[in-house]
Curated annotation (Swiss-Prot):
Transcriptional regulator that regulates glycogen accumulation in response to the amount of glucose available to the cell. Acts as a repressor of the yegTUV operon, which may be involved in glycogen accumulation. Binds at two adjacent sites within the yegTUV upstream region. It comes from the Bacteria. SUPFAM superfamilies: Chorismate lyase-like (SSF64288), Winged helix' DNA-binding domain (SSF46785). The gene is ggaR. Disruption phenotype: In rich medium, deletion of the gene results in an inability to repress the yegTUV operon and promote glycogen accumulation, but no effect on growth is observed. In minimal glucose medium, the deletion mutant promotes glycogen accumulation, at the expense of poor cell proliferation. The mutant shows increased biofilm formation. The keyword Protein biosynthesis does not apply. This is HTH-type transcriptional regulator GgaR. GO terms for biological process: negative regulation of DNA-templated transcription. Transmembrane segments: none annotated. Residues 22-90 form the HTH gntR-type domain. The lineage of its organism: Bacteria, Pseudomonadati, Pseudomonadota, Gammaproteobacteria, Enterobacterales.
């Protein structure tokens, strides 16, 4: 822990001294987030107190407190009186990468798992048909599952896939994209839309989440190398555990 704190303080001081117009509390918060991404800080680590951070970095306690508030609002940390500020189990998910959930989890050094709720053929709803470029009422597979990261439930996902793309639905394990690749179908890129809403009763029946914490809703179309839609998914994700990244 001492080594992690030493590295964090060094990174904070370097960022604070950088000559740009970014507000100090944002520099502070960004540095903590980068330390989590790089593995310097891990889930469950306790940060130094506000007074120590202020003394070691030369910034005011007000600035430190503002940075901690920003981090708490983003779900990066949890603050509790008498216990301190703890790093949450954040999963950073790229909206640009066409790798799929399981592969992204593994690449970030975490353990993925899936609990299947449903795998069945249904008639394609109008909204889904538009996204998949198929006829409304045509056969599609509806795949519903609960996603886990390091044995913690983080999201509920529903996917619709044109029926002709799945020859053996029981062969799909924790990763739909692994199944696609086994059938020589290669997801190339994705189109995503992100919104927020409060958790409903169904979400809370599967995933424990404070009713005051919003759920992130990600609607995504996956396209193959010929730019043909191969999957349309709607994911409801815990906003306190997910960080979505979209970079050019």
């Amino acid at each position: 822990m001492e080594q992690a704190h030493t590295q964090l303080i060094a990174q904070l001081n370097e960022r604070i001294l950088a000559a740009d117009n970014t507000p100090l509390y944002i520099k502070f918060a960004e540095t903590v987030k980068n330390a989590v991404r790089s593995g310097v800080l891990e889930h469950g680590n306790i940060l130094p107190g506000e007074r120590d951070l202020s003394q070691l970095t030369g910034v005011s306690r007000i600035t430190v407190r503002k940075a901690m508030q920003a981090l708490e609002e983003e779900g990066v940390v949890t603050r509790s009186r008498g216990y301190g500020t703890q790093i949450n189990n954040i999963f950073e998910y790229s909206l640009k990468e066409a790798r799929g959930f399981s592969q992204q989890v593994v690449l970030r050094g975490k353990k993925p798992d899936t609990l299947w709720v449903n795998k069945r053929v249904v008639k394609c709803p109008e909204e889904v048909a538009q996204q998949l470029a198929v006829e409304a009422g045509s056969d599609v597979f509806l795949l519903k599952r609960i996603r886990y990261v390091d044995e913690e439930a983080v999201s509920i996902e529903e996917s619709w896939v044109p029926a002709h793309l799945i020859h053996d639905v029981d062969a799909i394990g924790i990763s739909l994209y692994d199944y696609f690749r086994s059938q020589h179908i290669y997801p190339q890129r994705t189109r995503s839309r992100v919104s927020a809403r409060m958790p409903d009763a169904e979400f809370q029946s599967h995933i424990q989440l404070d009713s005051k914490i919003p759920v992130l809703v990600i609607k995504q179309v996956a396209l193959d190398q010929q730019q043909r839609p191969i999957e349309y998914s709607i994911s409801h994700c815990r906003s306190d555990l997910y960080v979505f990244v979209c970079e050019e």
